[in-house]
Amino acid sequence: MTEFHLQSQMPSIRLIFRRLSLGRIKPSQSPRCSTSFMVVPSFSIAEHWRRMKGANLSQGMEFELLGLTTDPQLQRLLFVVFLGMYTATLLGNLVMFLLIHVSATLHTPMYSLLKSLSFLDFCYSSTVVPQTLVNFLAKRKVISYFGCMTQMFFYAGFATSECYLIAAMAYDRYAAICNPLLYSTIMSPEVCASLIVGSYSAGFLNSLIHTGCIFSLKFCGAHVVTHFFCDGPPILSLSCVDTSLCEILLFIFAGFNLLSCTLTILISYFLILNTILKMSSAQGRFKAFSTCASHLTAICLFFGTTLFMYLRPRSSYSLTQDRTVAVIYTVVIPVLNPLMYSLRNKDVKKALIKVWGRKTME
C-alpha cells in the first residue's frame, strides 16, 4: 500500500525538484512560515562539477606559446629569418631526396640512408617551423590541445628516428671502411631497408610513449607554454599533479635511445679510427677520413644539442638556453645537413651536374 502511494506521488515529487533546481520556488512570505532555505541553481552545480572533474577537458582547451620574444619588431625580423631558413630547408632536403632517387649512381646503401635523413629533416622541421611563423605575426600565440599533442607526437617521432638513423649511418661507414670486401653483403638492400624501417619504428614507438605519458596528465591554471613549440619539459611544468613518475619514465626512454645510439656511433668510429691508423698510405687515410667528416659534423651538432636538452635534471632548465638549443636542432641543423653532405661529396656533385645538364639539354 505504501509502495503504491509513493508511486502515485512521484510526478509531484519530480515537479518540486525540477523547480528547486531552476530556482523557481521561493520561501513563503507568511509570518507563520519560519523555515528558510537557499536554492542553488543547476547552472552553478554543473559549473562546480566541471571544475571538480579536473582541468584536462580537451574540448576547447588551448595552450598559449610564449614564443622567442615579445618585441614586435624583433618578431618581424625573426619571421623573415625563419622563413628564409625554412625555405632553404625544404629546397635543400627536397633536392637531395630527388637527386638520390633519380640518379642510378647513388643507389647505394649509404645514399639510401642519406635520402631517409633528408626526408626526416624535411618532416620534423615542418612540424615546428610553420606554427612558429604563424605565431610571429599573430596577436594570440595559441595552439589547440589536439594540435599540441599532434605536434609533439610527430616531432618526437621524427627526431628520435633521426637519432637511430644517424647511428645506422655510422654502422654503414664502419662496414665500408673496415670491411670493404664484405660491404655489399653486410649492407645488402635488405639490411639497409631493415635499418631504415627499424629507425622509424623505434622513433614512433618512443613518441607514442612520450606523448601518451605527458598528455595523460591533468593541466591546471593558465596554459602558458614557455617555449615556441610543444616540447616535453615545458608541457610537463603545466601539470597540476605529481609528474615524478612520468619524468622518470621519459628519462629512462630518452636515456636508452641516446645511450644505444651513442654507443653504436662510438664503437663504430673507434673501429674506423683503428683501421685508418693502420693504413700505410697517407692518401688512403685522408680519403677514408674525408668520407666520415660530414657525418661526424652532423653527429656533433645533433647529439650535442639533444644530450644537452633532454638529459638534464628539470631544476637546471634555463628558458633562454632551451630556446637557443631548440632553434639549433629544429631550424639550423635541417638547413646544414644537405649542405654538409653535398658540398663535400664528389658523387653528389657529379650526379647534380649530370641531372642539371640533362634537364638543360631537354
Swiss-Prot record:
It is a multi-pass membrane protein. Belongs to the G-protein coupled receptor 1 family. Odorant receptor. Keywords: Cell membrane, Disulfide bond, G-protein coupled receptor, Glycoprotein, Membrane, Olfaction, Receptor, Sensory transduction, Transducer, Transmembrane, Transmembrane helix. This is Olfactory receptor 5AU1. The keyword Protein transport does not apply. SUPFAM superfamilies: Family A G protein-coupled receptor-like (SSF81321). Gene3D superfamilies: Rhodopsin 7-helix transmembrane proteins. The keyword Transmembrane helix applies. Residues 1-79, 140-150, 216-247, 312-322 are extracellular. Residues 101-116, 172-194, 269-290, 344-362 are cytoplasmic. The chain crosses the membrane at residues 80-100, 117-139, 151-171, 195-215, 248-268, 291-311, 323-343. It is found in: Cell membrane. It comes from Homo sapiens (Human). Disulfide bonds join 148-230. PROSITE patterns: G_PROTEIN_RECEP_F1_1 (PS00237), G_PROTEIN_RECEP_F1_2 (PS50262). InterPro entries: GPCR_Rhodpsn, GPCR_Rhodpsn_7TM, Olfact_rcpt. GO terms for molecular function: G protein-coupled receptor activity; odorant binding; olfactory receptor activity. Its main location: membrane. Glycans are attached at residue 56.
